[in-house]
């Protein structure tokens, strides 16, 4: 009968632990690279959106200035002032790369999970449309869209707040939490004084129609 000494067994266990730690670290590094790649990709999209918006607004401003020279009116002056504000807002978004939206969404084929994520897109709902891809039977429903000057910081704070409800506790970049939306709303209102409207029960028309068939 072959016996394994305690010393050898201890060495083997330590070896397996080291190999496991190495594999875990490698997977974490891979996940972080994927996250950085995704952030860079979105940043490129945002910069293109900002540049396109700037071009459009400047063109509109030039048009209304020409109209104002020909037909002076308070209405045209107000329109130019409104465009100037939009240009200033656009420039501000370009200068503040931490500004964006924290979204809280869910999908009827993933009950009762919530996804808490961040986007810097000028129209954040475009990002939700992209997330509602072919891997989901229904579109994501939006419970909240919260603008923040430090969107990534707010997202990290909320992820930490609801860490015990995280579905995937290994991959920290999987942003799904099995937590009731009313609990999230209560924490946002009472602890963080976030006054944005929280929709506790948004409707997915495709889901409602499918259930009725």
Where are these regions (language model features)?
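Non-catalytic accessory segments flanking enzymatic or RNA/DNA-binding domains
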Residues: 1-213
């Amino acid at each position: 009968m072959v016996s394994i000494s305690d010393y050898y067994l201890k060495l083997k266990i330590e070896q397996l632990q080291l190999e496991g730690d190495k594999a875990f670290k490698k997977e974490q590094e891979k996940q972080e690279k994927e996250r950085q790649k995704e952030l860079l990709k979105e940043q490129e999209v945002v910069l293109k959106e900002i540049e396109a918006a700037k071009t459009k607004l400047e063109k509109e401003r030039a048009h209304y200035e020409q109209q104002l020279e020909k037909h002076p009116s308070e209405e045209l002056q107000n329109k130019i002032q409104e465009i100037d504000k939009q240009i200033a807002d656009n420039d501000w978004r370009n200068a503040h790369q931490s500004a964006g939206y924290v979204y809280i969404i869910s999908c009827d084929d993933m009950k009762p999970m919530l996804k808490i994520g961040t986007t810097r897109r000028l129209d954040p709902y475009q990002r939700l449309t992209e997330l509602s891809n072919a891997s989901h039977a229904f579109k994501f429903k939006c419970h909240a869209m919260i603008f923040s000057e430090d969107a990534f910081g707010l997202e990290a704070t909320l992820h930490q707040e609801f860490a015990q409800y995280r579905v995937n506790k290994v991959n920290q970049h999987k942003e799904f939490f099995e937590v009731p939306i009313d609990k999230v709303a209560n924490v946002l209102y009472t602890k963080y004084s976030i006054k944005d409207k929280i929709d506790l029960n948004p409707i997915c028309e495709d889901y409602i129609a499918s259930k009725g068939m």
